[in-house]
């Protein structure tokens, strides 16, 4: 199995630990919840996207993945347009265009009773030379931890998500080789999956 991301800047999983926090508890986590209601927040080059289950019971009792069990919410932010020609994010742009959407998504999660959110960021965040400042801004202003995905993590996540959610799942499982190309707003991932 091979995955290639054609974006040039990456995350070093050893040294960039401050960019690797994923989980944020929105409820009091000093009282652990047996079956927390969770959400995924994706901060992409083009948008901020939220996905959470209508009911975890429906998701986990279903024999296969079904988008009908989830509530998708997304807002176009054009985050990548805040990067200058040196790949530095204009923080005024970020605070005006992106941060309000993240804060609004947090309000939605609280209203929907989400206990924990897993937040990931992709190419624009990974590429930004001031990515630490961006992540700190999100943490201080929205109180949300964010994990910037490495190029490989983004490729593998795309391949996994497509593999469980596509109507061509059977064909993928029966194929000896599968090639996937994900052209996103700020990166292109090429994933090759070999069975056996």
Task: Enumerate the predicted regions with their spans.
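Conserved phosphate-binding catalytic cores of ATP/NTP-utilizing and phosphoryl-transfer enzymes
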Residues: 19-33, 149-179
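A short acidic Gly-Thr/Ser loop motif
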Residues: 41-47, 180-187, 195
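Compositionally biased, intrinsically disordered low-complexity segments
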Residues: 7, 14-16, 171, 175, ...
């Amino acid at each position: 199995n091979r995955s290639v991301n054609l974006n040039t800047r990456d995350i070093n999983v050893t040294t960039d630990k401050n960019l690797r926090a994923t989980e944020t508890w929105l409820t009091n986590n000093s009282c652990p919840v047996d079956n927390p209601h969770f959400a995924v927040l994706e901060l992409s080059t083009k948008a901020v996207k939220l996905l959470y289950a209508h009911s975890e019971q429906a998701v986990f009792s279903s024999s296969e993945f079904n988008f009908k069990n989830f509530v998708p919410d997304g807002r176009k932010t054009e985050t990548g347009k805040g990067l200058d020609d040196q790949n530095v994010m204009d923080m005024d742009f970020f605070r005006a265009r992106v941060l309000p959407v993240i804060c609004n998504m947090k309000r939605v999660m609280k209203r929907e009773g989400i206990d924990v959110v897993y937040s990931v960021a992709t190419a624009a965040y990974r590429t930004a030379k001031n990515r630490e400042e961006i992540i700190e801004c999100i943490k201080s202003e929205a109180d949300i931890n964010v994990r910037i995905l490495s190029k490989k993590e983004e490729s593998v996540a795309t391949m996994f998500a497509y593999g469980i959610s596509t109507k061509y799942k059977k064909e993928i499982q029966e194929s000896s080789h599968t090639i996937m190309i994900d052209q996103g707003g700020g990166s292109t991932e090429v994933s090759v999956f070999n069975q056996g």
